[in-house]
UniProtKB/Swiss-Prot annotation:
HAMAP family noted in UniProt: TruB_bact (MF_01080)
Functional note: Responsible for synthesis of pseudouridine from uracil-55 in the psi GC loop of transfer RNAs.
Domain of life: Bacteria
Molecular functions (GO terms): RNA binding; tRNA pseudouridine(55) synthase activity
Protein name as annotated: tRNA pseudouridine synthase B
Residues of the signal peptide: none
One Gene Ontology term from the biological process aspect of the record: tRNA pseudouridine synthesis
Pfam families linked: TruB_C_2, TruB_N
Top enzyme category: isomerase
Active site feature: D38
Length: 312
């Protein structure tokens, strides 16, 4: 079983724990997830099975979309409702101020990784240092918040929908919004609605998998490797070239000119497919596609990033 299964994660388990359970239930040899969800969080968690685990490095780069609820007036050491409370303040806010705060944290913003997170320092996740009482301050990172839409105010709770780049911590965003509002805040609910092109509409629950009911229906939900990178341009190649690439060949301009090449800029990613739709490789173009005709003969036109042995 090679492919991607979109899971609607339940609260209470780590993403890695979910992966281990899916491996056991489905009997797959390898599995991995793209985009960690905290135990508190629910929603879209792409699970990559067997050969599809090679796609994790690409799927993890995708933008995300969430629905979050924050509790105003309460600050915790973990920035979510499960952590030890460190401060309480009365939230004296209105809709205008809340909308202003959401707008303030839209666009490129700077975030420090939470002390209780899976980000590694000296090979160990930050939460392991924090539990030992060691406070590690990592440099801030710039992330992108594309939109923050207010959905509901039921003080002290505020619910909003946010679309953002990879690496954005919604816990940190809630805490920063609380400080902007002058009362502090922590995240109380988080649901991921989208990860790249994957949404809840195609998701299954762990309970669906564990029940074993409708196994054929479940297997029909497994997304082929070639569909895992839907936003990446595709080039269909011959079986002969597929074999050469899988043996380590880096195609040059003269080789690629034999095929239909979509419009690509220098640095764009591309996926090579067989005529039957099997994923051969993911590569990065070293020239714009309109420069292939004048590229150095015999010099690679792409850099192969990952090779796949897709049985499609």
């Amino acid at each position: 079983m090679d492919g991607i299964l979109i899971l609607d994660k339940s609260p209470g388990k780590t993403s890695q724990k979910v992966v281990q359970e899916v491996k056991r239930i489905l009997g797959v040899r390898k599995a991995g997830h793209a985009g960690t969800l905290d135990p508190l969080a629910t929603g879209v968690l792409p699970l990559c099975l067997n050969e599809a685990t090679k796609l994790v490095q690409f799927l993890s780069l995708d933008d995300k979309e969430y629905r979050a609820t924050m509790l105003l007036g309460v600050t915790t050491e973990t920035m979510d409702i499960e952590g030890r409370i460190t401060d309480r303040r009365e939230p004296e806010v209105d809709e205008v101020r809340i909308r202003e705060a959401l707008q303030f944290f839209t666009g490129p913003i700077s975030q420090e990784p939470p002390r209780y997170s899976a980000v590694k320092f000296k090979g160990r996740p930050l939460y392991s240092w924090a539990r030992k009482g060691v406070d590690i301050a990592l440099p801030p990172r710039t992330v992108q918040v594309y939109s923050s839409i207010l959905e509901e105010i039921a003080l002290p709770y505020v619910t909003f929908r946010v679309a953002c780049s990879k690496g954005t911590y919604i816990r940190t965003l809630c805490a920063d919004l609380g400080e902007r509002l002058g009362c502090g805040a922590c995240m109380s609910v988080l649901r991921r609605l989208r990860c790249g092109c994957f949404t809840l509409e195609t998701a299954v629950s762990l309970e669906d998998i564990a029940d074993g009911k409708g196994r054929e229906t479940l297997l029909s939900r497994v997304i082929p490797l070639s569909d895992g990178l839907r936003n990446v341009a595709a080039i269909e190649i011959s079986e002969e070239l597929s074999g050469r690439i899988r043996d380590g060949f880096q195609p040059d301009g003269s080789t690629l000119r034999e095929y239909h090449i979509p419009s690509l800029a220098d640095g764009d990613m591309v996926k090579f497919l067989t005529s039957s739709g099997g994923l051969v490789a993911v590569a990065r173009f070293l020239y714009a596609s309109d420069q292939l005709a004048v590229s150095d003969m015999g010099q690679p036109a792409v850099r192969i990033l990952r090779v796949f042995h897709d049985r499609a």
